[in-house]
From Swiss-Prot:
Disulfide bonds: none annotated. The keyword Transcription regulation does not apply. It comes from the Bacteria. Belongs to the universal ribosomal protein uL29 family. This is Large ribosomal subunit protein uL29. GO terms for cellular component: cytosolic large ribosomal subunit. It holds the Pfam family Ribosomal_L29. It comes from Mycolicibacterium vanbaalenii (strain DSM 7251 / JCM 13017 / BCRC 16820 / KCTC 9966 / NRRL B-24157 / PYR-1). SUPFAM superfamilies: Ribosomal protein L29 (L29p).
Amino acid sequence: MAVGTTTGELRELTDEELTDKLRESKEELFNLRFQMATGQLANNRRLRVVRQEIARLYTVLRERELGLAAGPGGEDS
């Protein structure tokens, strides 16, 4: 997942793309935590960035679920 993906960019994605990105981010977070536990992680900041990215993804998905935001193209998903 790209570093610095904004919420606006995430809102332009479809639900399937969002769930794919969420899965990828969770896998990356798992790998980063494993590296941290074994002392191989050089960049601790990446953990925080990935957690924030996951939170943004959940926020966009929840907005759509509640009907607060439309899907890509202005249509409700």
